[in-house]
Swiss-Prot record:
The keyword Chloroplast does not apply. Belongs to the COX16 family. It is found in: Mitochondrion inner membrane. GO terms for biological process: mitochondrial cytochrome c oxidase assembly. Its main location: mitochondrion. It is a single-pass membrane protein. GO terms for cellular component: mitochondrial inner membrane. This is Cytochrome c oxidase assembly protein COX16, mitochondrial. The chain crosses the membrane at residues 32-52. InterPro entries: Cyt_c_Oxase_assmbl_COX16. Keywords: Membrane, Mitochondrion, Mitochondrion inner membrane, Transit peptide, Transmembrane, Transmembrane helix. Required for the assembly of the mitochondrial respiratory chain complex IV (CIV), also known as cytochrome c oxidase. May participate in merging the COX1 and COX2 assembly lines. Coiled coil: none annotated.
Length: 118
């Protein structure tokens, strides 16, 4: 919480310096890396190590959902498939492309819209 008085009297300052916050502030002013930087970096490192376990657990769960197929299961899947010949597929797809019964129709423009003809 912000204090109302910006400046403290000597008596107030001495009382504040005796508190834990006052002693920590004075130590931080003298050695900022030791009392601010080092705890900050330690917290960041500890959090990364702590959250790495959660990430590993998440990937373990995902791996459990995706299971490897055994040879028997793979053979069961192959039973129902039809055999594919490249030439037959090529000619089949060519026949699908021969649809010349369509007609290009221009979409009417809205009133006031330009034709974009150069």
């Amino acid at each position: 919480m912000l204090e109302q008085n910006k400046f403290k009297t000597k008596k107030q300052q001495q009382a504040w310096n005796k508190t834990l916050a006052g002693r920590y502030y004075n130590a931080m002013v003298k050695r900022p890396f030791l009392f601010f930087g080092l705890p900050f970096l330690t917290t960041i490192y500890a959090a990364s190590v702590y959250f790495a376990e959660f990430t590993a657990y998440r990937y373990e769960i995902q791996d459990g959902k995706v299971k490897a197929l055994s040879e028997e299961e793979a053979l069961k899947l192959d039973k129902g498939r039809r055999k594919v010949d490249m030439k037959e597929e090529f000619y089949r797809l060519q026949q699908l492309g021969k649809q010349d019964d369509w007609e290009q129709v221009r979409v009417p423009r809205m009133k006031g819209e330009s034709d974009n003809v150069f």
